[in-house]
Amino acid sequence: MCIRDRDRLARSVGKQLMIDSAEIAGLMNDSAFQQKLGYNKETLPCLFIPETYQVYWDMSAEEFFERMQKEHQKFWNQERLDKATAIGMTPTEVCTLAAIVEEETNNNPEKPMVAGLYINRLHTGMPLQADPTIKFALQDFGLRRITNAHLAVESPYNTYLNTGLPPGPIRIPSPIGLDAVLNHTKHNYLYMCAKEDFSGTHNFASNYAEHMKNARKYWNALNERKIFK
């Protein structure tokens, strides 16, 4: 399940445990509680590591968050912390980038490639220009074609207008997504475009001219299928 906001997470937890979802949501929206955990409202989703856990169904909301904090610390072992440091990122920044990577592709083998591309952009000061951040900024996750009008949306999550990472993750990434960033593929690609066969994978390019050739193939495929939005 893709969880993009705190309210949906609260509802999901409430269905599994004897905790009122409003109580979970209340804590997640409490700035003092966020700060106690080491986050703010934008970065709090980074606390959660999606996995199957055995928990007491009658645990309290506070106990739930304590357990999630322990699982977070368990995931972020020294090896992963060292890998994050090596690429100049904190765990929260890794989470934020992993969320974008997982929105870009459902293809697990491709995720380290996509992560490597975004890390290249970050290291060269280029905007990420990640379409999923536009969908998040607009809260329109059904968009299939991003237009110039969409790219003009004023939002700190618009990675076309703002350089660097957005304020927080646009979804809760999986362990696979997090590890894709930590173990990203090293290459010289700076551009990518969805493949014209709609396979869910991408064509990668190291320069803009090559990228535009790939983009035209995809645009033509969209036009042929009459996908205009």
Predicted regions and their residues:
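Short, small-residue-biased leader/transition segments that mark boundaries at the very start
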Residues: M1-I3
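Bacterial extracytoplasmic/cell-wall-associated proteins, especially those involved in peptidoglycan
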Residues: M18-A22, G26, F33-K229
